Amino acid sequence: MAVDSLLQSGMASPTTSETEVKALKFIEEITRNPDSVQEKVLGEILSRNSNTEYLKRFDLNGAVDRKSFKSKVPVVIYEDLKTDIQRISNGDRSPILSSHPITEFLTSSGTSAGERKLMPTIEEDINRRQLLGNLLMPVMNLYVPGLDKGKGLYFLFVKSESTTSGGLPARPALTSYYKSDYFRTSDSDSVYTSPKEAILCCDSSQSMYTQMLCGLLMRHEVNRLGAVFPSGLLRAISFLQNNWKELSQDISTGTLSSKIFDHAIKTRMSNILNKPDQELAEFLIGVCSQENWEGIITKIWPNTKYLDVIVTGAMAEYIPMLEYYSGGLPMASMIYASSESYFGINLNPMCKPSEVSYTIFPNMAYFEFLPHNHDGDGGVEATSLVELADVEVGKEYELVITTYAGLYRYRVGDILRVTGFHNSAPQFKFIRRENVLLSIESDKTDEADLQKAVENASRLLAEQGTRVIEYTSYADTKTIPGHYVIYWELLSRDQSNALPSDEVMAKCCLEMEESLNAVYRQSRVSDKSIGPLEIRVVQNGTFEELMDFSISRGSSINQYKVPRCVSLTPIMKLLDSRVVSAHFSPSLPHWSPERRH
């Protein structure tokens, strides 16, 4: 089903509202001539920010054309901007990157020197994000009509935030949105089953309990389930498995559990949970007490049409478990966005997860694309980047953006493949995040992070004369929550030495966690979205077998390198068949919401 064909027919459907028709027409108009829109966007960004320190360094002298911009302004990564961002963070209010005041920083899931990256934001950015967000339901209603007749059970949470030394908030993009006046004053009750008081509660346990309880009370109104990440939705199912008895008790008695002590939630829930519902309680007990939870989502929420969850890139690993619990419901990956900017949406949301493509909206930012066949360790030729309208189907590119808030030719790190066009606007499949080895949810651990963690932890073995001679890893998403698994092959100075004790190995697990970046540690400590890190010790010679296996599959013996992350089933089976002991982190690593500025 195509958006444009429905519009050309004069009416998307008899139930399509005037607002939805307007949104669909906007999509058609903005994608017809993206190059013209891009030229206008860049001109606006450069003209309004011409007096910034950053642009003055490159002698643009007020030029707003693409040729001058591309020939004079360099392509950069976060480390190139770190000094400028630090100045803003420390309270410098002069026009360093943007002529408009920086109102807050959105924290990226990427890290620099172990700490979250800070992305500058200006007040009007929320309008751009909301513009794109307002297009989602009009598109979805083309494929699943009548969604406005029910509600979405979305598990939404605020995350910890901090304040920079200069007084600016630093927080994730969605936390910023949930705490904005736009969300606080919106009529979310007509859209979500979760009350705002629960979404805004900083205690994730109370928030999850309340959101699940409301979803159960309104089970017949629910027509879609969602979360930001698939791990979040699976965590909610796991929470229900562990708490259905208490939830059923609340419903049976019409009283709220004593574990909920947040005043705002208690006040709000007094109007929602205001009478006993023995019939619903007995139904839940009957369903949840079964050992087999296959299809549990449609059993409890029978009117659910789809799951609203991102399952592209590394998140595709969660698809089998989502299919199991949902009974095979469609999964809609609707939006492509980051803390740097919002990029585009999926105009065919009911497609298979493997076929998801996002249409980039040319009014969001100025987009350039770095062909992904260059030497990643070398410099980037500033003029080699491709315009949005000039990308070629089948080719892969790294996304480079210039934003209204003051990022200029910034490498986002996302690798995208062009799959086609909607009108003249290209559509992209998200392939992966550059240089990321391990990811469970919002965490992103690269090879350097992992190597540092292994080196720090392996020092604990030195006293016993033992060292790590090889290692690899994988992100285990079959457990809830998912967790990092690290395979170690050890070598003792004295071959008669026994393996290190479980106590020592557990300390190694914790030391690895302490060495990983702030995003990982927040996910472990505050968000509880990642489980304890596991080290599996394998037999000596295992990594030689791994090399033999790879060579038998066509790898060159001269070019073979031990993969620092594995995912192929035969390799996983080989490694697991050689495990002699497994050890878990015994406690939580250190983490504080207060960043070092």
Curated annotation (Swiss-Prot):
Enzyme class: ligase
Keyword Ligase: yes
InterPro entries according to UniProt: GH3, GH3_C, GH3_M
Keywords associated with the record: Ligase
An annotated Gene Ontology molecular function: indole-3-acetic acid amido synthetase activity
Induction (free text): By auxin.
EC number annotated for this UniProt entry: 6.3.2.-
General function of this protein: Catalyzes the synthesis of indole-3-acetic acid (IAA)-amino acid conjugates, providing a mechanism for the plant to cope with the presence of excess auxin. Strongly reactive with Glu, Gln, Trp, Asp, Ala, Leu, Phe, Gly, Tyr, Met, Ile and Val. Little or no product formation with His, Ser, Thr, Arg, Lys, or Cys. Also active on pyruvic and butyric acid analogs of IAA, PAA and the synthetic auxin naphthaleneacetic acid (NAA). The two chlorinated synthetic auxin herbicides 2,4-D and 3,6-dichloro-o-anisic acid (dicamba) cannot be used as substrates.
Similarity comment text for this entry: Belongs to the IAA-amido conjugating enzyme family.
Protein name per the record: Indole-3-acetic acid-amido synthetase GH3.4
Organism: Arabidopsis thaliana
